[in-house]
C-alpha cells in the first residue's frame, strides 16, 4: 500500500525537518510508503515551498523535490522494500544553509505576489539603511532590475553618507532611482500646524510626519504607474511598534514582515557573498531612522542582539513574559 498525502503546507524556516520527522515516523509505524506532495507558490502573505517527499515503509526518505520549484518528478518504488530512484532525486538542490533557503523564500514570495496581481513592477523607498537595502535586493532578484524602481527621499536629518550609500546600492544593482527631497512638503506641514501646535517642543509627531510624507510619495508613484510599493519594515520593529502608521508601514507587500532584524543582517551578508552589492557602510553602521539629529535605534530599543531572542521566545514560542 502507498499513502498519498496531498498538502498545502506553508513555508517556515524549521518546518522541513519537522515534516521529515513526522512523515518518517508515520511511514515506519504503518509500514507503508508515503508520498507527500506539497503546493508550490505564493498566496498573499503565505509562501508554499514544495519540498515534496517520498518515504519507504522503513521511514527512510528516498526522494525530495527542490525547494520553491514546480515540476513533474518520477521515482520508482519497489513495494517489497527496495527503492529504485531515478536521477531526478536531485539531492544537491537541498539547501544546507539556512540563509539561502530563507532568502529564496522571500524572493519567491515577492515574485508570485507581484505577478499574480498583475502589477507592472515595484517601487522601494531607499533610505541608505539595511532593511531597504535588503528589500531592494530581494525585489531585483525576484523581478529583475527593469521592473524595480528605487526612490531616495532625504530630509534635513538625512546624512550625506545615507544618500551616498543608497545611490551606490542602486547603481551597483543597475536599478532606476530618483531622488526627491521631502523638505518642502515637511516644512509645509510644520507651517500649517504651527498655529495648532503653539510652539510645543518637537517630538515623535514631527518624526512621524516625515515618514508619512515619504509614504505619500511612494503611493503616488504606485497609483500613477501601477507599481506595488514594497514596505521595508522588519519583524523586530513591527513587534514593538517602532514604526509609523501610514508612513514606513505604507505598502502593498512587506517582504521582511516575518524577518527579525538580526536575521536581516545575516541575509544581507549572505547576499553579499553571492555578489557584493550592499555597501559595507550600510551593514556596519548602527541602525538609525534619521528622523531627528543624532538618532539611533538603540536610543529607543535594546540592541537587536538582545531584543530579538526575547521577542522570539514571547511571540514564536509563546513563553510567558516573566
Question: Which role does the model predict for each range below?
Answer:
Residues 68-87:
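A short, polar/charged loop-to-alpha-helix boundary motif
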Amino acid at each position: 500500500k502507498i499513502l498519498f498525502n496531498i498538502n498545502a503546507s506553508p513555508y517556515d524556516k524549521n518546518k522541513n525537518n519537522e515534516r521529515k520527522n513526522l512523515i518518517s515516523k508515520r511511514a515506519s509505524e504503518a509500514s507503508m510508503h508515503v508520498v507527500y506532495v506539497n503546493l508550490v507558490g505564493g498566496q498573499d502573505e503565505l509562501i508554499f515551498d514544495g519540498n515534496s517527499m517520498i518515504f519507504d515503509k522503513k521511514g527512510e526518505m528516498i526522494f525530495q523535490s527542490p525547494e520553491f520549484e514546480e515540476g513533474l518528478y518520477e521515482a520508482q518504488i519497489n513495494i517489497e522494500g527496495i527503492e529504485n530512484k531515478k536521477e531526478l532525486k536531485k539531492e544537491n538542490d537541498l539547501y544546507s544553509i539556512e540563509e539561502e533557503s530563507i532568502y529564496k523564500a522571500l524572493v519567491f514570495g515577492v515574485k508570485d505576489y507581484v505577478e499574480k496581481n498583475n502589477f507592472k513592477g515595484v517601487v522601494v523607498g531607499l533610505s541608505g539603511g539595511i532593511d531597504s537595502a535588503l528589500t531592494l535586493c530581494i525585489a531585483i532578484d525576484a523581478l529583475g532590475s527593469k521592473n524595480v524602481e528605487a526612490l531616495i527621499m532625504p530630509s534635513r536629518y538625512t546624512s550625506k553618507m545615507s544618500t551616498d550609500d543608497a545611490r551606490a546600492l542602486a547603481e551597483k544593482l543597475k536599478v532606476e532611482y530618483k531622488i526627491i527631497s521631502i523638505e518642502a512638503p515637511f516644512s509645509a506641514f510644520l507651517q500649517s500646524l504651527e498655529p495648532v501646535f503653539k510652539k510645543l517642543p518637537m517630538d515623535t509627531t514631527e518624526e512621524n510626519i516625515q515618514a508619512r510624507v515619504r509614504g505619500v510619495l511612494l503611493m503616488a508613484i504606485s497609483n500613477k504607474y501601477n507599481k506595488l510599493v514594497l514596505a521595508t519594515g522588519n519583524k523586530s520593529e513591527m513587534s514593538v511598534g517602532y514604526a509609523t502608521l501610514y508612513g514606513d508601514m505604507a505598502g502593498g507587500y512587506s517582504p521582511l514582515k516575518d524577518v527579525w532584524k538580526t536575521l536581516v543582517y545575516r541575509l544581507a551578508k549572505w547576499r553579499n557573498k553571492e555578489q557584493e552589492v550592499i555597501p559595507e557602510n550600510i551593514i556596519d553602521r548602527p541602525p538609525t531612522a534619521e528622523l531627528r539629529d543624532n538618532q539611533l535605534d538603540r536610543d529607543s530599543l535594546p540592541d537587536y542582539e538582545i531584543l530579538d531572542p526575547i521577542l522570539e521566545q514571547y511571540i514564536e514560542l509563546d513563553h510567558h513574559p516573566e
